[in-house]
């Protein structure tokens, strides 16, 4: 798999992603975060299935998402729909001295990802719905929603948990939205051409 991983890293580098994003992808082994039957495809630039209809996004989509998120040292970051924990691990590699929270409604995935990331002391994973965010740990510098929100419906509770200044990245339909809060003013950019599993409200 070493050759396949090197090809992926070269591809991401050629797409212009930052050194810190490339280094995170180099450090974190994707094969540990996918089921055994699809490990052979770990470094193909494709989404792969997880449990109960969940997926792990293709690496180029994750790299683009992280570039929009703009994670920085010392930040508090929340991922909703953290799946197998791959993106949490990448963020942890970039934000080594920050605090990272993952909410995953699928109990099996939450348990597996906790075990995979138990040595990452700056990551905390909770098995619960992300609909209400994580108010007890708010505000967050960054919020990443890793499932498609319905009809441009970013829950207001999440926006209220965003620090000022702060950024939310949220898939809506076939687009990624970058929502930025600065001086109490909220702006939005849309990046079309993506596909995500839908936001699950109940387990």
Language-model features, listed with the residues they occupy:
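Positively charged
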Residues: 142, 202-203
